[in-house]
Amino acid sequence: MTTSHQATSIELVTDGLTLEVLTAGAAVRRLVVEDDHSDGVVDVVLGHHDARTYAICGGYLGAVVGRYANRVAGGTFTLDGHEHHLTTNEGANTLHGGADGFDRRRWTVAETGADHVRLRLTSPDGDQGFPGRLEVEVTYRIGPGTVRLDYTATTDRATVVNLTNHAYVNLDGEGSGSVDDHVLRVEADTVAPVGPDLLPTGLAAVTGTPLDWRTPHRIGDVLASDHEQLRFARGLDHHFVVRGSGMRTAAVLTGRSGRTLTVETDQPGVQVYTGGHFDGTIVGLSGRRYGARAGIALETQGFPDAPNRPNLPSTVLRPGEVFRSTTVWRLS
């Protein structure tokens, strides 16, 4: 364990896999793979060249986002008859917990072992406008070809919770170019289409749209279509309702080399974001700048804007309850 630029770095190593996690944002900074798909080692997640950037303007790279991942319309919601006003950071809306979300916080190391690290954060009552003191933990655990993420949260007052990790993946290597040549499959019959503000407009079948990824497609081929949903999001930035319940496969991604990432989760959906905002501003660990679609985020989570949509599964957490969520990344 080393400390650099006031951010603690924890490195977990197993056969063929190295994971670096920072206390800044509880962020995955590196996921280095050594396998038969390439010569030498390859870092398959995007990470900032300067670790100090995570706590300042990290762009969510590899970070845990919260208290509410994704968007809350108008930066407001009503819970138990009380209206709560959140900080807004995407026009009139709240994205990923607000202007000072969990991605910008200094998490503390609660426990470390040879194969895992557990990080903890306390979010006080009223933080970014959210009610209740929230105690959050995330545990990263590595095994042969796998990274497991376990989240827990408790509160002393009714609140809403939606946590995810915002890692951007490029299976051909961080800084190697766009993910256009990656092939993606998403286990979803239903998606949440978006409006120009990227808020969901409801739920719809994926059939007959460029949001149908039930059979694998090359990302660049689909994103080349002239479709309103792709124009709004500069590619994909959509919540897909994962088929089934319990732990199951949400998405499968394959790079040019044949390296494959399978994402498994117990959450209702996965937000698929193809990184349309990257514009060369962010410098990666390789020293290269990240252009459009430098990585793809597969964010397992509850429904966006669920606090304002009673027809969707609830994301409310009450005193005495424990929020739990598990996601597994499998590399092969």
Give short role names for the model-derived ranges.
Residues M1-S332:
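An exposed, glycine/acidic-rich loop-and-rim segment of catalytic or binding clefts
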